[in-house]
């Protein structure tokens, strides 16, 4: 006998502190869920406020406005007829909790505070909230007076409880709790909970979705049950892009999966599931039954006199469970094309900007940034042509276009909002200038090509007049410090010109009511980690879409875009040697990034991963690389590379304190805002670690020709 229930979860593009906008998106998701016959609707974590409010959560106004929005939602008759699972902060006994509020027909059933808070990486939940440290305990919560008038209730249960309907049992866990070893869904499943909801504020990282889906599928495969995952999506005001992918799973299989990247502000995912499949699946495993009979945690049941199953007195062949489907994953190249593009669109439309300005150097990094803007233009154009009303409204506002205008191609949109500029000097090659121009023509940007030698000469002349000294390049006999100073003059003047052109180009083009353009940066994560950039040069911008992406991944993305977007010009960027073009070129010398850095981009990726993800200091990194790089490199060569990396990392650490806000994409990002917190005054020699490394090198060289047990080295 079937026991069919239709359930709904969603991706919502919420914005921190946009209370009314967030409310409207919640209402729209409820309306869609109800139209599809869902009896339970689950939304993202902290959906009323937006997840990324940060220290604004410490303001009691945020709790006040959350209750005001919540009251408007549940008193709306159109939200009645299904159970609502909505997230917001709640103050209970003068303690602030990250909560889920479950309601039905305008009545609050109970409030469930988050038990295990996310407090690593980009997450700092324990700065704002307190975890609920009373498993299985439920207390009375006194509703605010204004809410009492709406619901007719004075007290509601607050704590670790579950809902008992007439035909099933529903439990909830929140985001991080899925990732913990002792997840709440385990104890709940053993206590008979059949439907588990998870409301999340999970951000995008390259290749991270696999981990999230594996956890959900393994949870329902081991415990049985239905799992509804909801997530925020979009840029809600910070470096993070929440990547949606709402889904519904049952017994280790997926029956519905939402999109990971999209310009849709509201996406509702529904499925019809058969609870008899859950009961049969669980009852067939005897060891699971034994554990359930011995389970010590018994959850408080909140009884509701409602049956959630589809109301039908006899078999209906037109109603059937949703079919199982395979999980969908984007390739890393697709993730780079889509994630930063959606993030940039949210940023642009929400800051009331006119468009973007990009210093287009002819190198692969600025090329990658330009291609992400092109990808954004493709997404916006497709959405507008497919009738996405919010996108149409936003694109007309940004372009200052009439009520009947819709872009007819990505290039049409780019010509209105994307501005690029090649800022050449006598050190620039004809090849890079032509590549920049050809790429601009291919993507449709408004392009400026200028020479800035007179500006550079003016600054050098000013210095010469003031000091009586004139710096010259190294290849002409100058010192290293003169050489760097002359390079930095060019780099920093490009930043000044970028902001000048970003402010005035809309005026030059006669764009009405323009507030200027957003300046885009193009420093990749490896260069940021190594400090291979000039402080306050073109790496200093308003936002940087590639600042969390490695050079290796960017090259793969450009190769992908060349084929996907049919742009053969991109192959010229792939085949070019990465160079800053800040020094004069001769027939015997052309500046090269990797030669300047003393290490390859591939090596930088390894160093970055070991430093951040594996938590290695110089000594531990050296020992790990002895295993990875021997015998291709000698122990002494490995030690020199490790020492060189940490030396330049340390002396350039101060640069990371002022990095342009970048799209978070890589787990070894050196972003200093809150992801990778380190002092910025460090002894670059790491003397004690260096001595220990030298001791190991000497041991290895002494044992040359014989086997050395590296694991025995202390």
Swiss-Prot record:
Record key words, sorted: ATP-binding, Ligase, NAD, Nucleotide-binding
UniProt cross-references to CDD domains, sorted A to Z: GAT_Gln-NAD-synth, NAD_synthase
Enzyme Commission identifier(s): 6.3.5.1
Reactions listed under catalytic activity: deamido-NAD(+) + L-glutamine + ATP + H2O = L-glutamate + AMP + diphosphate + NAD(+) + H(+)
PROSITE patterns: CN_HYDROLASE
Superkingdom per UniProt: Eukaryota
Active-site annotation: 45 (proton acceptor), 114 (for glutaminase activity), 175 (nucleophile), 361
Presence of keyword ATP-binding: yes
A Gene Ontology cellular-component term: nucleus
An example Gene Ontology molecular-function term: ATP binding
InterPro entries according to UniProt: C-N_Hydrolase (IPR003010), C-N_Hydrolase_sf (IPR036526), Gln-dep_NAD_synthase (IPR014445), NAD/GMP_synthase (IPR022310), NAD_synthase (IPR003694), Rossmann-like_a/b/a_fold (IPR014729)
Domain CN hydrolase: 5-275
Region called Ligase, residue ranges: 329-714
NCBIfam families cross-referenced by the UniProt entry: nadE (TIGR00552)
Family of the protein in this entry: In the C-terminal section; belongs to the NAD synthetase family.
Note: Present with 172 molecules/cell in log phase SD medium.
Protein name as it appears in the record: Glutamine-dependent NAD(+) synthetase
Species of the source: Saccharomyces cerevisiae (strain ATCC 204508 / S288c)
Lineage of origin: Eukaryota, Fungi, Dikarya, Ascomycota, Saccharomycotina
